[in-house]
């Protein structure tokens, strides 16, 4: 209902609950009829992977705290493909940092480890001792055992399901 109010020009200002990028086309198509303007704010939006570095599972905690594991996760993620699919090509790949123009912006950090390189991701994981795989093709611990890893997301994000599915595919690829 709120989406239609916005598209009809019945709201003065609203972003929460309707500000998902998937609604952008609806708003742009209805600007003239609704007598409003759609504005894309210059802000930092972070769709990201956040590890539970303090999980009670000691083996996962050790893995998640390995710098090379986190780098492998960064290299496995195809940010260009993701932006094209989820945000119709809008956006610029960056690490989760303050935006350009902020006095806290640090370009080297913002652009670190952004390249999509599944070969490098595989090399890093192999180097950590996770080179063996089970019969389903999933990596296992050096002792041959495995763990399940859950990907949790906030369902309030309209793109959360697609984001999680893409992330799971990237993990499967490495």
Which sequence ranges carry the predicted segments?
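Extracytoplasmic/periplasmic ligand-capture domains
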Residues: 1-88, 92-93, 101-174
């Amino acid at each position: 209902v709120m989406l239609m109010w916005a598209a009809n020009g019945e709201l003065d200002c609203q972003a929460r609950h309707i500000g998902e990028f998937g609604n952008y086309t609806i708003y742009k198509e209805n600007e003239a009829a609704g007598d409003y303007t759609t504005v894309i704010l210059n802000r930092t939006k972070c769709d990201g992977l956040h590890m539970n570095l303090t999980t009670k599972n000691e083996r996962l905690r050790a893995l998640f705290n390995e710098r090379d594991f986190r780098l492998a996760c960064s290299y496995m993620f195809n940010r260009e493909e993701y932006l094209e699919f989820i945000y119709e090509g809008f956006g610029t790949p960056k690490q989760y940092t303050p935006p350009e123009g902020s006095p806290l912006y640090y370009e080297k950090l913002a652009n670190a480890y952004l390249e999509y390189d599944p070969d490098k991701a595989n090399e890093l994981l192999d180097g950590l001792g996770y080179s063996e795989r089970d019969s389903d093709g999933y990596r296992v611990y050096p002792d041959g055992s495995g763990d399940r890893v859950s990907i949790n997301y906030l369902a309030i994000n309209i793109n959360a399901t697609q984001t999680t599915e893409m992330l799971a595919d990237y993990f499967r690829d490495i």
